[in-house]
Amino acid sequence: MERSPLPASGKTSISAKVLEAVRFFFAFLKEPATVGALIPSSRILARAMLDLVDLKSARTVVELGPGTGAITGPILDRMDSSGLLLAMELNQQHVEQLRRQYPRAKVFSDSAQQLPKYLRRHRVSSADIIISGLPWTNMPLAVQEEILDAVVASMNETSVFMTFGYTHVQWMPGARRFQGLLRKRFGQIERTRTIWRNVPPALVHVCRAPIVQVQGEA
């Protein structure tokens, strides 16, 4: 019996989701610094994040660290068909999976620091929305700074940057340091309530009004 093809949006069956979680787990064991979590982000978290922005009117959306695509699919479902989605992912297995499952997305195997280069390649001066699933607290301080500077350089005055963190680590030194980096780079930051139905519970930082020039770190 032939299997029916996946929908264009990339929606998957329950068995496919289980397989996705298994792949994600083994990717974490192989590269914990770049994968950052034992399980992929949930559709519940994706919906909570995407409800905060207007993807339908966005012309260019960027996803940093899409992993296995838990948020990528919902992004494409909400975007206009003429919109551009750029995704930056270091894990090569995830890159190959994303390219197969979401052919509409432009998926690049490169570090998030290189985002401005890929925007220029597509003749885009700035992104309307940048969504991050990166494991910030697993990164050295210098890498966090480089990525955030690349994000700011890829935004305009109306752009939005969103990233999530797990609630149980928000008061740890690494998470508090990252929050300080955000405050130095954005004039407006909102933090959502805890999304308890995600595993583990998470919250979202919504950042606007990018501060273009950062005069060093204290």
Explain the meaning of each model-derived region.
Residues 176-218:
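Class I S-adenosyl-L-methionine
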Residues 68-80:
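Conserved SAM-binding loop of SAM-dependent methyltransferases across substrates and taxa
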Residues 57-67:
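Conserved class I S-adenosyl-L-methionine
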Residues 84-89:
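Conserved SAM-binding motif I beta-strand of class I
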Residues 155-165:
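Conserved beta-strand signature within the Rossmann-like core of class I S-adenosyl-L-methionine
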Residues 95-124:
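S-adenosyl-L-methionine
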Residues 145-157:
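A short glycine-rich, Lys/Arg-flanked "PGG" loop and its adjoining helix->strand segment in the class I
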Residues 21-56:
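Class I SAM-dependent methyltransferase Rossmann-like catalytic core
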